[in-house]
């Protein structure tokens, strides 16, 4: 086992006991937002450096790579810390739809590339509708919502709009009847516009509930709703920020689960990230290393010991083609003694049974049975009448040995 690169840090793949980093006192303050859908270590590290930023895997993996580059901030929300109170449409897991929410002040998280939003309480309670709660989301999952300044919509624009009677969930759609006057048409004076949604429904939506989005945002929203594996990944899961003292980590594997997935939140198990790289990037995830016993058990199951099966019967050597069969029979009845003892034993066998057996010294094999003797009378076990002794001649049958 090699020594650890830094004192107090566990060795990758081998250590089963790690050192837990004690969190500094933050005046007993507890984050007010709900981190139930995030990885548990995200709530254990609010004191990390503010230049550590959260980023999401481009392949929609739930575990997030961490980078040590400065976050540019939310341009449409102004400077960092001034986003509190703004109304937005935030995408909420696990359904992937957008809901009306309000941004809460959290400057520390904004500097790292995340936002705290509070979803509006639904007018009609139901199992599918979200309750009023606070969540941590990413800027790319937030759409500006300004009821007083509607966007001038026209035919073919990509929007987010509610299609249900309750108007709680917002989905991607395309405007069929816009507000601007086209060639040969009059300007629409209606308070509703017609939107064709991604699920094939066409509905008239109030103008104040429709929000224009860029085509890239619209395309990403459609892909998340249409691809089942994307919805199951729960890509809004936050991960521990990168520790700058250990150097950057990169790469992500999604081909199998790690040996111990207790360090991930339950929704992330279907698309778990590489445990070795995630744990080696931050000392806070030390207690989740898998023990040595589980690794050894897995290795034992993968590499079973081969079983040696003896041959059913001795086969006679009829020619040069059957030399491997004769050699195999000889190896089963011979021991690991020296070559000189084997030669003495063969000479004694020749002297003891000159009439019933013949020895082929050229190929160094077991005695050859005569043609008149049936092979079915013999077995790979030792005959009862044979006197097995290596340091003396074998007596004839019926006479005791010396």
UniProtKB/Swiss-Prot annotation:
The lineage of its organism: Eukaryota, Metazoa, Chordata, Craniata, Vertebrata. Residues 393-402 have a biased composition (Pro residues). InterPro entries: DUF4537. Residues 332-402 are annotated as: Disordered. Residues 370-379 have a biased composition (Polar residues). It comes from the Eukaryota. This is Uncharacterized protein C11orf16 homolog. It comes from Mus musculus (Mouse).
């Amino acid at each position: 086992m090699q020594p650890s690169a830094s004192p107090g840090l566990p060795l990758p793949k081998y250590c089963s006991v790690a050192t837990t980093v004690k969190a500094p006192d933050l005046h007993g303050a507890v984050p007010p937002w709900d981190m139930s859908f995030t990885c548990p270590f995200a709530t254990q590290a609010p004191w990390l450096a503010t230049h550590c930023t959260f980023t999401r895997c481009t392949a929609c993996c739930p575990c997030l790579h961490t980078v040590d580059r400065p976050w540019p901030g939310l341009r449409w929300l102004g400077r960092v810390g001034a986003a509190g109170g703004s109304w937005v449409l935030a995408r909420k897991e696990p359904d992937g739809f957008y809901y009306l929410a309000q941004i809460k002040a959290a400057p520390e998280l904004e500097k790292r590339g995340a936002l705290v939003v509070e979803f509006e309480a639904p007018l009609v309670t139901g199992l599918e509708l979200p309750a009023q709660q606070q969540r941590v989301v990413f800027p790319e999952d937030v759409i500006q919502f300004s009821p007083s300044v509607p966007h001038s919509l026209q035919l073919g624009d990509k929007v987010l709009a509610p299609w249900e009677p309750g108007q709680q969930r917002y989905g991607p759609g395309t405007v069929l009847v816009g507000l601007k006057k086209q060639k040969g048409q009059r300007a629409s004076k209606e308070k509703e516009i017609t939107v064709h949604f991604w699920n094939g429904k066409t509905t008239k939506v109030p103008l104040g509930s429709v929000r224009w989005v860029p085509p890239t945002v619209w395309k990403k929203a459609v892909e998340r709703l249409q691809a089942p594996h994307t919805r199951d990944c729960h890509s809004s899961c936050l991960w521990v920020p990168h520790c700058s003292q250990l150097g950057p980590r990169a790469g992500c594997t999604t081909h199998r689960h790690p040996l111990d997935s207790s360090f991930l939140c339950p929704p992330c198990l279907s698309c778990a990230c590489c445990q070795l790289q995630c744990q080696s990037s931050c000392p806070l995830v030390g207690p989740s290393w898998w023990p040595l016993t589980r690794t050894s058990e897995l290795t034992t199951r993968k590499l079973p010991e081969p079983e040696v099966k003896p041959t059913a019967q001795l086969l006679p050597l009829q020619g040069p083609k059957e030399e491997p069969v004769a050699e195999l029979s000889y190896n089963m009845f011979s021991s690991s003694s020296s070559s000189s003892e084997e030669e003495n034993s063969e000479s004694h066998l020749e002297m003891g049974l000159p009439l019933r057996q013949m020895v082929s010294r050229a190929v160094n094999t077991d005695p050859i049975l005569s043609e008149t003797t049936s092979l079915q009378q013999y077995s790979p076990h030792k005959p009862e009448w044979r006197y097995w002794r290596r340091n003396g001649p074998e007596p004839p049958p019926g006479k005791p040995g010396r």
